[in-house]
Amino acid sequence: RLKHFIWETFSSHYVELVKARAYNSENRFTKEESDGARWTLYYCLENLLKLLAPVLPMMTYYIYHHLWKKDIHFEKFPNVNGKTIKGVTTEDITMLNSAIWRAKKDKGLGLRDDLSSLEVPLKFKPMEKDLVAAHRIKTLTYGELTISV
């Protein structure tokens, strides 16, 4: 389940969604927004390494020691913080990204090709800049899900 989360959810959906904000090469995001994305990626890397340490001891030791100059095997195992975020769920993001990627593929386009317009439910409003940057959306509106390639 951890491998599936890292590979299929975290990498495929979260990292793809925030990488434009983390790099901020086109200056679409404020410094605070960009720093927030990088901090979250850093936090996730640290905790994913701790979760993987029992099954990949040598690799996680090497990476963790290189980044933090500590032995990961003496660090505390991460705890669930119990916080939930209302609004957009992981399933919502996965469904939206998959629908966009499928629409582009069906039209013979690459994932980095522009999307002429996208209409999404209002709950995605806080992610507007990330969606536009990640999917190269020309026009984003709110309502029922409609994808125009």
Task: Please identify what each model-predicted range represents.
Residues 1-149:
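Feature 926 captures the class I aminoacyl-tRNA synthetase adenylation module centered on the KMSKS loop
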